[in-house]
């Protein structure tokens, strides 16, 4: 029986969606799902929810729950990671210390001071998981949803030989958004998308085989469209291609927007994310708001006479189904660059189309990106490379240098100011950074 392990199972919406996504495939209705989390209360509640779903849908799946990661991993075929080290207590200084210095992050989980420190907290756990997998399930496929995606996957590939792929929903989300914007049914759209996580590019976007970029550019002139997606449309105008991640995210990865109150206001004025108003530190506030909601959200679901279950567009379950059943599918995955994008560094983490079937994940070589797009990607890859080196060597100087290279931080602060800010972040997050003690 196929065994699928969730590490960090205590996420209500994500665990519920991914559980049902997996069980919605007939070939996966009798798998073993092992839920693992360090929080016994959350784990118990997610286990109840999982058992309720299996019973309601009359499936033959077996549900296990454990606090012991090694027990969960033993004999596994697929590992899905979805956790955050340090929780809200660690996320607060990621946002608030840079904000004190004038570095205004909207999300702070991918690049910049927040992204680098989130990665440094996560790296020791990733290494430990990789070591356990090498011993207990060396042939398993590791499906990672933990951010910062590019740094995490690059690090995993540096410290282990475990098969892995990093997944995000920005490609499918933006491709659908563009189709809706131009009035096209999604089943009539084809595209080529490649780059790095949160900064991949729609190199082609076609409607019934015809280039749809002229339509996209025309729609972007509409003031109502523009105010919802300011940063991405400005990047389209300047560099010629549409980027995958949202404007509030994208505005953190380049030096052009978040150093000016006028531009920050433009980006945030009418934008929303998951039906929430966008503002500085918005995701941190969402975490605060949700901190006490976990139990109530699960109880609300369990109290319903019938759970409404629909398949999401996340890639995770499609990958598992394709490997188990042999039905091929195409995803956009974050994988090691082995000649896939020739003008980005070998070994870095790139996001490219991948064919998935019974043989596993096979990334598609893309060739060279347009030079201006590769140049933008490299500004982020430089930060990632130094952060990964810091995690491997435990040398603090690489952390300072990574954040000195960050496009947003370097647009706002001097080198001495960056050093002071990073030192303060080290002090605030010391308990989650054992490798630097």
Please name every model-derived segment.
Residues 183-437:
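Long, compositionally biased stretches enriched for glycine and/or charged residues
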Residues 62-75:
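Short acidic low-complexity segments
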Residues 27-51:
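NAD(P)-binding Rossmann-fold cofactor-contacting core
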Residues 89-158:
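Rossmann-fold NAD(P)-binding glycine/threonine-rich loop
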Residues 2-30:
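N-terminal Rossmann-like dinucleotide-binding module
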Residues 74, 80-81, 144:
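Redox-cofactor binding/interface segments in oxidoreductases and associated redox assembly factors
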Residues 31, 87-88:
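Short glycine-rich, flexible loops that bind phosphorylated cofactors or substrates
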Residues 129-202, 206:
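Internal, well-ordered domain-core segments that constitute the primary functional module
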